[in-house]
C-alpha cells in the first residue's frame, strides 16, 4: 500500500460560488454526514493506513482553516486515527498557488527531507471530490500502489457514466496485470465536445481523468527532470537546504518557515502535473477504478447529493427547486431553480445552467460588485 498521502487543497472553487469563494473555497463546504469535502479526503487518507505522513498542501491564506477542519474531524475518529492525525499529519502552505506540479514536487521533497529512511510511495488525492464506497477505493489504491512501486506513474481512470464535456479523458490500452485492473495509457485527451464525448462513451476504452495519482518520489523527480526540467531545477537545491520549521495551529502541525520552498516557488512554472509529466512520460498507466466518483464541479451536480433543501426554507406552489442558504428563504410559484445564499451573497440559477456561474463571478469581479 502507499506509504504517504498528499492532499491538494489549494483550489478556489469558483464554480460553486457563492458558497465557495476565494476566502472560503469549495473544500471547506459541508457535504454528506455533516463533514466537509476536505474532511472526507482526510478520511480517505486514513483509510489506506499509510505508515508515513499525510501532507495537506494548501494556500498560505487558508492554512488555519485547514487546521480547524482537521481538528474538528478528531471527534469522529478512532484513537489510532486521532494519533495518526496528531503525529503524522502536516499542513504545507504554498507561498503562492501554482497549479499542481509545484505542490506535488514540493510535497515529495518535504517527505524526503523529514524522513529519508525509506522510499516514499505517494498517493496524491484531491480535496474536493466525492468517492464511494470506501472499501472499493482502498482496494483500488492497493492495486495502484503495486504498479507505482514498480516504477510506474499511476493515474486513476474513472468509468464514464455520461458523455461529459467537462473532464479530460484517458484512452487505455493493453492490461498490465492479471486481473485486468491496471492498463497502459495510450493517450490523454483534452475536454471534448459533446459529439466526441458520446463517441468516447460508446467505445469503452476512454475514461475520465480523476486528477489522482500514485508514484514513488524518486520516479516523479526523475520524470520531471526528463520532461519538465525547469520545474525539476527549481527544486534542485531543496535537498541540501535547511529543514522546514514547524509550529501548531489548532493542535495540527504546519510548516511555518522553509526558505528552500520560498526560493523554489519563485522559479517553478505554473503548470499542471498532467501537462508536466502524465502526458509526456512513457511510464504512465491507469487503474480502472471500481469506486464511484464525482468532482461535484457545479451546482447541478451538488444538488444531486441531497434530497432536501439546506437551511430554513418555505415553498408554496413550487416544485423541483434546491435551496442552500444560511438565512431563511421563501419561494412562491417557482419551478426548476437553484437558490444559493451564503456569505452575504446570492445566486439564483435555472437548473442546467451551472456553466454560467464562472462567467457571473468574472463579471462581478470586473464590475467590482
Stretch-by-stretch model annotation:
Residues 7-9, 57, 123-126, 155-159, ...:
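Short beta-strand segments
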Residues 85-175, 214, 222-228:
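Conserved beta-loop-beta/alpha segment of the NTase-like Rossmann-fold superfamily
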Amino acid at each position: 500500500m502507499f506509504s504517504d498521502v498528499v492532499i491538494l487543497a489549494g483550489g478556489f472553487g469558483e464554480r460553486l460560488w457563492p458558497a465557495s469563494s476565494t476566502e472560503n473555497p469549495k473544500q471547506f463546504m459541508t457535504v454528506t454526514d455533516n463533514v466537509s469535502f476536505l474532511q472526507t479526503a482526510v478520511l480517505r487518507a486514513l483509510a489506506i493506513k499509510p505508515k508515513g505522513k499525510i501532507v495537506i498542501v494548501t494556500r498560505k491564506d487558508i492554512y488555519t482553516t485547514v487546521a480547524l477542519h482537521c481538528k474538528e474531524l478528531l471527534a469522529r475518529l478512532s484513537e489510532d486515527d486521532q494519533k495518526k492525525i496528531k503525529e503524522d499529519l502536516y499542513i504545507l502552505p504554498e507561498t503562492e498557488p501554482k497549479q499542481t506540479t509545484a505542490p506535488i514536487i514540493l510535497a515529495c521533497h518535504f517527505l524526503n527531507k523529514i524522513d529519508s529512511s525509506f522510499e516514499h510511495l505517494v498517493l496524491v488525492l484531491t480535496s474536493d471530490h466525492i468517492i464511494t464506497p470506501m472499501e472499493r477505493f482502498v482496494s483500488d489504491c492497493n492495486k495502484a500502489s503495486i504498479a507505482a512501486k514498480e516504477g510506474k506513474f499511476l493515474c486513476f481512470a474513472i468509468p464514464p457514466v455520461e458523455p461529459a464535456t467537462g473532464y479530460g479523458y484517458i484512452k487505455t490500452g493493453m492490461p498490465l496485470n492479471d486481473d485486468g485492473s491496471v492498463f497502459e495509457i495510450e493517450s490523454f485527451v483534452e475536454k471534448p465536445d459533446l459529439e466526441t464525448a458520446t463517441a468516447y462513451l460508446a467505445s469503452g476504452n476512454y475514461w475520465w481523468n480523476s486528477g489522482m495519482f500514485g508514484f514513488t518520489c524518486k520516479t516523479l523527480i526523475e520524470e520531471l527532470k526528463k520532461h519538465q526540467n525547469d520545474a525539476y531545477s527549481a527544486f534542485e537545491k531543496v535537498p541540501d537546504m535547511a529543514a522546514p520549521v514547524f509550529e501548531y495551529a489548532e493542535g495540527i502541525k504546519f510548516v511555518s518557515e522553509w526558505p528552500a520552498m520560498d526560493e523554489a516557488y519563485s522559479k517553478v512554472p505554473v503548470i499542471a502535473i498532467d501537462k508536466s509529466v502524465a502526458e509526456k512520460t512513457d511510464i504512465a498507466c491507469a487503474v480502472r477504478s471500481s469506486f464511484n466518483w464525482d468532482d461535484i464541479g457545479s451546482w447541478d451536480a451538488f444538488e444531486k447529493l441531497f434530497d432536501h433543501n439546506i437551511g430554513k426554507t418555505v415553498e408554496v406552489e413550487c416544485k423541483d427547486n434546491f435551496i442552500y442558504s444560511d438565512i431563511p428563504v421563501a419561494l412562491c410559484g417557482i419551478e426548476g431553480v437553484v437558490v444559493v445564499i451564503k456569505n452575504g451573497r446570492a445566486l439564483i440559477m435555472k437548473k442546467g445552467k451551472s456553466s454560467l456561474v464562472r462567467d457571473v463571478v468574472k463579471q462581478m469581479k470586473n464590475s467590482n460588485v
